[in-house]
Amino acid sequence: MSEARRIAVVPAYNESPTVIGVLDQLIGEVDEIIVIDDGSTDDTRSKIRTWIDGQSAPARLIAFERNRGMSAAYDAAFTGLKQQLAAGEYRADDLVVTVDADGQHDVSVLKMLHDEIEIRGFDAVMARRDLSDYPRFKQIGNTVMSQWASWWAGSKFHDVESGYRMMRLGALADAMTYYKGYRYSETVEVAVVLSRLGYKVSNDLVVPVPVMRSNTRLRDAVQDLCMCPVAWYRAVRRRPVRR
């Protein structure tokens, strides 16, 4: 059997200074790149289009006309991948990598995430960010969120808000039946749903954070807290979301 393909999914919103650098780093590390421009008001979209036009490797852009939030950006990409999986264009063991466009995810550690899946047998790996340089309130908030999500997931998470992940496409496609995603809740919902569906999820691999970004609003944090039990209910009760 051929090696699993790696597909990078990169949401971007007003990331003009950093997005091309991130995409350049991904070339050679993944087999395909999907970029979602989440209604940027700067020149992020035009830069992405120019970059894609100059690539020989598979890369494509999904563009929103208005800002819809990170969860909607991921949903657009994941839905397309799920449909292509059903059509036989991808395999269930192919790997989806989520990478932020702001440069806070160190692409050089992708191999470590890959080894967690291929060698240790996980279905999904969420990188555990080293937040030691972040403000104390951010560290406390992350700990509270992770402990709360762990309770609903039935699995231990140290950094459930991490957007730096690698997941088997088959597991991700299965999880999509049971989560909705609102604004920024996609990461915590997917963690809860994957765990409750019986997939093996790792959140132990500690990775550096080259760029510190901390702009989470209280409203978004409260929404994420609320979505954990909602995700649990959908997964445990097997009540699919109307999509």
Regions found by a protein language model. Give the residues of each.
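Short, well-formed alpha-helical segments that are part of the catalytic scaffolds
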Residues: Y13-E29
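Conserved sequence signature across two-component system core domains
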Residues: A12-Y13, I36-D38, F64
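Conserved donor nucleotide-binding strand/loop of the catalytic core
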Residues: I34, S46-R91
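Hydrophobic helical membrane-anchoring modules
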Residues: M1-E3, V9-V10, Y178-R243
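Acidic helix N-cap motif at the loop->helix transition within catalytic regions
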Residues: P17-G21, D42-W51
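Short aromatic/hydrophobic "clamp" motif used to bind/position activated sugar donors
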Residues: V96
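Short loop->beta transition adjacent to catalytic acidic/histidine clusters or analogous donor-positioning motifs
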Residues: A4-I7, L26-V35, D43, P58-R60
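Acceptor/aglycone-binding surface of glycosyltransferases and processive sugar-polymer synthases
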Residues: E65-Q83, D93, Q104-Y184, V211-R219, ...
